């Protein structure tokens, strides 16, 4: 019996999707544009990084070649030295969205059949009846925001008023999301979670995918910063996923990072949410060391997206990629005979792009492990090919979307 490890590099797209024009994202290319900026000297930051993007281990696994399949060109400095060490290709999303749950569910074999509901980019953004109900049921003096906004910017802009009035900051984006930011101490963390549970119920009628608690600390004088106590309240997947099939077969499942939230804590097994990317990867590899045969580990590394993509931070994104690349040898060393590892992404978030939202992109598919023969797999017509492949590798019965590529 075999084991499997899926690592999602949240937002590391490799070039605009065929339907990117429908989303205003034609020409977006998260990885390619980061590599270009770094090659031009525009990805430098004193004390953090400098020079071309250095991802030698990912290039060796075929990342540059996967990107070339999606965008038509190998990103600067990502040409592999020697033959690739793994299976490489790129995948197109079939779900009508560019959000985290849609991408992850499709990776797990469940493309979303209908688009999510979204709030318009107007002021106010939320229906008046939704706001009235939230204020009444949450016993609030009102809300702040009620608009599309990047999370860090709106907390900086409205944090002082929030402390003065006690009104939580409610905002949204191009994603199907209702976000509530509040001060952990002045408003209360548990009160924020309770309010988000109310919002989750109220948002169901609008087909909103996620309600997110965004706690922060600080003061107007010292500045505000978000904490690691974010909580996502997502709609449950509308059908069976790879995780459901693994659970039904009695297999061990370990979910690291945001995976538990993304799948609404259904069939997610042992959940570990240790914090930033480095801690999540360490937790995943520690879990792999004791994972029984037939088990599955699903890891999300969210900092690419939240800390750098949305903030349009090219040097930070590049440094995060380089930090992950440096740990590829550790991942390879942790794989036992019969293990399969897959590195992929769920959408794009081009830090050189306009605005602050995700970008509709293709994603890399890198599969490797002892005994996995290196070869190209070209363009996969759905992210679900990943779930189908992992299911086949684990010997799970599969009636989901997708076609195995191994």
Swiss-Prot record:
Q: What class of enzyme is it?
A: isomerase
Stated EC number for the protein is 5.4.2.7
The protein's superkingdom reads Bacteria
- Pathway listed: Carbohydrate degradation; 2-deoxy-D-ribose 1-phosphate degradation; D-glyceraldehyde 3-phosphate and acetaldehyde from 2-deoxy-alpha-D-ribose 1-phosphate: step 1/2
The note describing how and how many cofactors are bound reads: Binds 2 manganese ions.
The reaction(s) this protein catalyses: 2-deoxy-alpha-D-ribose 1-phosphate = 2-deoxy-D-ribose 5-phosphate; alpha-D-ribose 1-phosphate = D-ribose 5-phosphate
What GO biological process term is on the record, naming one?
Answer: metabolic compound salvage
Output the Gene Ontology terms for molecular function: magnesium ion binding; manganese ion binding; phosphopentomutase activity
Question: Under the cellular component aspect of Gene Ontology, which terms does the record hold?
Answer: cytosol
Keywords attached to this Swiss-Prot or TrEMBL record, sorted alphabetically, are: Cytoplasm, Isomerase, Manganese, Metal-binding
What's the cofactor?
A: Mn(2+)
Alphabetized Pfam families for the sequence: Metalloenzyme
Q: In this UniProt entry, which cysteines form S-S bonds?
A: none
Residues involved in Mn(2+) 2 binding: 305, 310, 358
- The residues the record assigns to binding Mn(2+) 1 are 10, 346-347
Query: Can you say where in the cell this protein is located?
Result: Cytoplasm
- Coiled coil, from the record: none
Q: Which NCBIfam families match?
A: deoB, PRK05362.1
Which PANTHER family did the record assign? PHOSPHOPENTOMUTASE
Q: What is this protein called?
A: Phosphopentomutase
Please tell me the species this chain comes from: Methylobacterium radiotolerans (strain ATCC 27329 / DSM 1819 / JCM 2831 / NBRC 15690 / NCIMB 10815 / 0-1)
Q: What is the lineage of its organism?
A: Bacteria, Pseudomonadati, Pseudomonadota, Alphaproteobacteria, Hyphomicrobiales
